[in-house]
């Protein structure tokens, strides 16, 4: 289907009016969203088969995530800050990367212009605490547990604008679960939301 859309788009027939091109754009967006959904569902179905015995340098992993998401943050002039201690974590490098990536990406998307996203990690006894804090509008108290439900969106009116398929946080929760950890969401006293993972 994507090949057909690309081919149709590339021809740019003179007869294509604005409405037609808008329809093509919408169909392309929906196709991209469907592809992302299928990939995420496949990722979720394979979580149990991924090895989780790698030694992960948390600070290096967080730095990599922030570097990868810097272009997205720049679109909204959002400052990304890493405050991670020199600690290690045993688990799946690829899954922990995806967990942090999804949390930071979500924090950027739902943040305000000129906002800030801070990733903090430290060790307490035998557990690693990792939090992602943003300066956005926050999440209503009654919806905080629902954000981990597949396809749930706090602000449905912005689903097209923000992209995605509503599976990012559901995948995060599953990654935390297979690592025998916990995840909580709470309000930031200075505004915004804090997701805290304990592994």
What annotation goes with each model-predicted range?
Residues 114-126:
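Short beta-strand/loop element within the Bergerat-fold HATPase_c
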Residues 139-153:
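Short conserved segment of the HATPase_c
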Residues 54-70:
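A conserved beta-strand-to-alpha-helix junction within the catalytic ATP-binding
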Residues 47-54, 84, 88-94:
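Conserved micro-motifs of the catalytic ATP-binding
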Residues 26-34:
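Short alpha-helical segment of the dimerization/phosphotransfer core of two-component systems
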Residues 72-81, 87:
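Short conserved segments within the C-terminal catalytic ATPase subdomain
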């Amino acid at each position: 289907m994507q090949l057909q859309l690309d081919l149709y788009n590339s021809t740019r027939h003179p007869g294509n009016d604005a409405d037609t091109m808008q329809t093509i754009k919408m169909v392309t967006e929906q196709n991209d969203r469907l592809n992302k959904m299928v990939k995420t569902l496949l990722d979720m179905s394979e979580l149990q088969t991924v090895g989780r015995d790698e030694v992960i340098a948390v600070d290096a992993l967080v730095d990599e995530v922030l570097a990868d998401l810097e272009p997205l943050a720049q679109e909204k002039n959002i400052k990304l800050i890493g405050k991670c201690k020199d600690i290690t974590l045993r688990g799946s490098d690829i899954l922990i990367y995806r967990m942090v990536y999804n949390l930071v990406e979500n924090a950027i998307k739902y943040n305000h212009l000129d906002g800030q996203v801070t990733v903090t990690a430290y060790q307490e006894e035998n557990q690693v605490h990792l939090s992602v804090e943003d300066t956005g509008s926050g999440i209503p108290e009654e919806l905080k547990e629902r954000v981990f439900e597949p396809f749930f969106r706090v602000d449905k009116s912005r689903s097209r604008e923000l992209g995605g398929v509503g599976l990012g946080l559901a995948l995060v929760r599953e990654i935390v679960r297979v690592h025998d950890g916990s995840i909580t969401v709470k309000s930031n006293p200075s505004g915004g939301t804090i997701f805290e993972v304990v592994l």
